[in-house]
Structure formats: C-alpha cells, structure tokens
C-alpha cells in the first residue's frame, strides 16, 4: 500500500512539473513593421510638433518606446531598403546609387541602365532567415532592394500580403506594411491612395475596382488653412513654402489613418499583446534639402516600438541607432543569433550589444541623373561630412524633385536673386571638402564649423572614424558605376544561377545547386491555388501522384532558374525574363 501511495505521489509530481514546464514555454512573438516613407521626426507629435493629428502614432508612443536618435544610412529609399533587408551598408556591396533598378526617365537619358547589385555569397535577406526559423513572412508591398528579392524571402510580397493569409493561426509572423502616402510624390500628386489609407480591398482582389474608385479623387488639405506652420529656413518663407508644409502634414495624417487600420486588425485578431510593433520611416522628409541629403533632415528618422503588454511604456531612448542595426535587432528580438556578416549590432533582444554604438554613418552617391559622393559620420551631437567632389555644386538638378511647386519656387527665387542667406547656401557652386555641424546649436546644419580651431579635436575624431568606416566596409563609392555594372554583369547581362541538379530515386527528388550562395526552393503545383510561395528545400522531396514539383534555384543579384519534376521525369529548365533584363 505504501509503495502504491509513493507511486501515486511520484506520478502527481511528474504531472505538476510537466505542467509547469509547459506553462514556462514562451510562445514565439510576432513582429510587425509599419513603414512610412519620406518622413522626418521633427513633424510628429511624438517628437514635439502637434500640428498633424496622429492619434495612432500617439498611442504607439504612449504604450511603447520612442527612439530619439535613429538614423537611416541614406537619404533615399532604395539604398536604405538594401540595408534594411540585408544588414549591410549599401556602399559595402555596390548598392549605393539611387537607383539600380527602375530608373527614372532622366537617368535613362543620361545612359544609366537597370542592373542588380550583387551582395556577397553568404548574405540572405533577413526575412528569409525568419522563414527558415518558422516564421510566416509577408511584405505589403514595396520592395526596392537594389536587387530582385529572393524568391524564398517572403511567403507573400504583394498588395494583398497579410499575416491573415497564413495557413495556421498558430504560426508566428513577420509582416511589413508600407505607407507610401508620405512619399515625395505626394507633394504634387494629391489623388487618394487606396493602399496607403488602408481601405478594405475588394474581395475579388480587383485592382480595377480600386482604380475606378480612386483615380479621379483628390485629397484636400486636412489641416486648417490658417495653420501656423514653421517653414525651415532653407525653404521659401512665403505661401508656397507654407502650403508645402500643410500638404506634408496632411499626408502624415493620412498615413496615420493607415497605421490605425492595421493596428485595429491586429487587435481584432487578438494579437496585440503577442506582437512587437515597429513603426519608422525609410529616411528623412520629402521637401527640398531634406530627401537625398545627409543633413539630419535627410538621415534622421522616427522610430517607435511597442512591446507586448506595454513594456517600457512612455520611455524615450536616446541611444544612437541605425538602419544597419535593424536586421540583427529583428533576429535578436525573437531569439535568433544574427549572422556574423551583418555590419550592424542588435540594440534590443537576446543578442543586444553590450556597448551602444558611438557613431552612425551615411552615404550619398548618384541620385537619378546627377552624380556625387559624400560620406557622413555623426555622434550624438556633431555631424561630419566628407565631400569627394568639392568642385560640384551642393544643389544637383533632378527632374523628379522639380515636380514640387516649392522646388520650382526655390529655383525661381535663385534666378531672380531673391534667396536669403540661408536659402542661398544650398545653391553654392562648390563645396568645402569637409563640413562639421553642431546639431544641438545648429539643428538645420547651416553653419560649417570645420575650420573653427575650437572644434579641431572633434573634427579629427570624426574624420578618423569616417576613414576607418569606409576602409572597414570596403566602400564601393570609389568604383565608377559603369565598372560596377561590368563586375555585376560581366557579359553585359545579369549572371545566371546554376540550373538545379536533380536526382530522382524511389519517388524522392533530391536537388543541389553549384552556385555559391544559391538557395533552393520547391512547391507543388496543386498548392498554388491558395499559396504561391516557395518552401525551403532542406532534403529530398516526395513525389505525389499526378502532381508536379516546381524547383527554383536563386542567388541574390542573379537571375533564378526554375525546373519541374512530374511522374519521375525532369522538365526543361528556364530563366524567367522581365523588362529590366539587359
């Protein structure tokens, strides 16, 4: 009897311990990135400017952490997104020019062709690493990575992509939603934007229905006509300058509405407290002397992170953070060790760096039809710029930017001798080789103190850091773009990923690829009706009667190859073409 009682006690203890073990097991967190475009932090209530009503961003700020020293690596989108997707500086692998794909007409007229930058062999898109670790990954919808995405990077990348499409609600997700309504083009294109405002998409996914609804619409100013705005000193201090500010604030409010729609969906699904929400902008503001430039108006970007259960709610974090830190931080947040090739450091999560970064770095190279090369280093107070083409003007004409009325007004004022001292600085015909700015006392970076003896030590420190950084990453800015293209496209065309090596035995399909850095994926044709993504190949795949297995091999920056297997026979291998092939 005693033995029986002891046995029952032992069983009970085992059950209790087992239950405790299960309860201690943490459920994987979801990650949601909400990405605005072309937006500086200076114009947001969370950062001190209440002119634009942003209730959803304000909520994130109240319930989360506001990061006050966050910086892009570039003042424009494509190089920034190259970094956000890889954890590499764009100028470390030839992705620094704006842009490599989808050239503007003026760039084509200047002889710039479409091409893909080619990252090193070992580099994966960070979303692919998330997929390999069990995450369902979606991107809605902007890509623009300076190379075509890995076909294994996303379960879905389209205007329809959503965590709600995952096949099992228990699968953790990493989802991105881009809000392009704040984009520079929104300063002159005032049509309502379906994708950015977050309206319900037609059930049949018909873009035509959306177009019919929105193509002739116009968004009026959402701020009062008499709103008292503060126009930056480098812009026209007249009605045109004020109207530009009002349009920018209006677009911020529209973006906030889209953010609110996604947050509501997250709450409807009961996922708010199971998700880390990261909201940021891809670079600085849309106005002249903001976007593309390496002043804080172009590099400094807002960042708000809401952690589950409002952890650290209301906190303001003044550590320096950079876009190159985002991929390692994303992985660190979900307990994945960042790969060694990443050039940034995690600022949160299990693999958070012990020492915060001391400097952030930035670059500016070709923008559309205009070529330059500038590098930037900044600590918490001082900004250093190195101009490698000092003989070139500060202002470089860009046909795209000149669609803006406020840009046209600046040029008119220049031509009529009406610019004041601050406005005229941007139109100087040559540059100083070195520039140094005290961003605390000179937030618009108008007063170059590089030659002031009082700041000689600061200048020397930042100059040394700039040189060290460029050497460390093997900066490709010194290579002419035409020579970069020859390196990436040695025969005048994109390099090809090797065809899949397929072996079929006993109903199993084994695949390999000889291209270094290539990835292998597969999918069954029967599954494409409800899922178009590719599964990672990790070992032999079973054939299914009457079904076709499609196989893909892809190395970033190369064209991918596709073949198929049906009834024990391999089909032809082909390389899909697109209008950007050369």
Regions found by a protein language model. Name each.
Residues 4, 450, 460-464, 471-582:
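Short, compositionally stereotyped local motifs that mark structural "simplifiers"
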Residues 17-27, 582:
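Bacterial Sec-dependent signal peptides at the C-terminal "C-region" and cleavage site
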Residues 21-22, 327, 334-435, 457, ...:
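C-terminal cap/loop subdomain of S1 sulfatases and analogous C-terminal strand-loop tails that border
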Residues 26, 41-51, 166-327, 331-342, ...:
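Active-site-proximal cap/lid insertion segments
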Residues 27-32, 63-68, 132-137, 169-174, ...:
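Loop/turn elements at helix/coil->beta-strand transitions in domains of secreted/extracellular proteins
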Residues 31, 37, 330, 383-401, ...:
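A short aromatic-rich beta-strand->coil structural motif
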Residues 33, 40-122, 129, 135:
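Active-site segment of extracytoplasmic enzymes that catalyze sulfate/phosphate-ester chemistry
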Residues 54, 84, 142, 147-151, ...:
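Polar, surface-exposed loop/tail segments
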């Amino acid at each position: 009897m005693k033995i029986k009682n002891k046995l029952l006690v032992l069983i009970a203890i085992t059950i209790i311990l087992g239950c405790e073990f299960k309860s201690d097991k943490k459920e994987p967190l979801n990650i949601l990135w909400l990405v605005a475009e072309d937006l500086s932090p200076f114009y947001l209530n969370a950062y001190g400017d209440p002119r634009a009503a942003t209730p959803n961003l304000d909520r994130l700020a109240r319930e989360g952490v506001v990061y006050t020293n966050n910086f892009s690596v570039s003042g424009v989108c494509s190089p920034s997104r190259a970094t956000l997707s890889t954890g590499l500086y764009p100028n470390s692998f030839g992705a620094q020019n704006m842009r490599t794909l989808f050239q503007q007409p003026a760039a084509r007229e200047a002889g710039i062709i479409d091409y893909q930058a080619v990252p090193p062999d070992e580099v994966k898109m960070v979303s692919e690493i998330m997929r390999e670790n069990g995450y369902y990954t979606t991107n809605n919808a902007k890509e623009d990575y300076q190379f075509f995405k890995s076909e294994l990077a996303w379960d879905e990348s389209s205007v329809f992509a959503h965590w709600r499409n995952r096949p099992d609600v228990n699968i953790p997700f990493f989802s991105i939603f881009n809000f392009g309504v704040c984009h520079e083009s929104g300063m002159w294109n005032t049509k309502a934007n379906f994708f950015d405002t977050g309206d319900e998409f037609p059930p049949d996914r018909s873009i035509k229905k959306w177009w019919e609804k929105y193509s002739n619409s116009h968004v009026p100013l959402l701020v009062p006509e008499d709103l008292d705005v503060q126009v930056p000193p480098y812009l026209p201090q007249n009605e045109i300058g004020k109207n530009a500010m009002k349009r920018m604030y209006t677009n911020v409010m529209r973006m906030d509405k889209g953010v609110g729609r996604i947050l509501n969906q997250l709450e409807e699904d009961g996922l708010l407290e199971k998700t880390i929400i990261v909201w940021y902008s891809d670079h600085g503001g849309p106005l002249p002397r903001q976007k593309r430039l390496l002043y804080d108006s172009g590099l400094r970007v807002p960042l708000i992170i809401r952690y589950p259960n409002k952890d650290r709610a209301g906190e303001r974090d003044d550590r320096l953070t950079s876009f190159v830190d985002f991929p390692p931080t994303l992985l660190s947040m979900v307990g994945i060790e960042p790969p060694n090739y990443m050039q940034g450091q995690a600022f949160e999560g299990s693999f958070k760096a012990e020492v915060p970064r001391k400097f952030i770095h930035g670059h500016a190279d070709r923008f559309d039809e205009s070529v330059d090369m500038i590098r930037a280093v900044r600590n918490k107070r001082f900004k250093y710029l190195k101009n490698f083409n000092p003989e070139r003007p500060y202002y470089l004409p860009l046909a795209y930017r000149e669609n803006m009325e406020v840009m046209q007004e600046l040029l008119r004022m220049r031509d009529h001798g009406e610019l004041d001292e601050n406005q005229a600085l941007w139109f100087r015909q040559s540059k100083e080789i070195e520039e140094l700015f005290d961003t605390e006392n000179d937030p618009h970076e108008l007063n170059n103190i590089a030659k002031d003896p009082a700041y000689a030590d600061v200048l020397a420190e930042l100059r040394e850091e700039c040189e060290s950084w460029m050497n460390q990453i093997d900066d490709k800015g010194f290579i002419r773009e035409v020579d970069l293209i020859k390196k990436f496209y040695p025969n005048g065309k994109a390099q090809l990923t090797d065809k899949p090596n397929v072996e079929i035995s006993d109903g199993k399909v084994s695949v390999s690829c000889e291209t270094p850095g290539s990835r292998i994926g597969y999918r069954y044709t029967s599954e494409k009706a409800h899922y178009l993504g590719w599964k990672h190949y990790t070992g032999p795949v079973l054939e299914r009667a009457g079904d076709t297995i499609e196989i893909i091999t892809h190395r970033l920056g190369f064209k991918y190859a596709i073949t198929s297997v049906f009834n024990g026979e391999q089909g032809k291998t082909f390389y899909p073409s697109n209008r950007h092939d050369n």
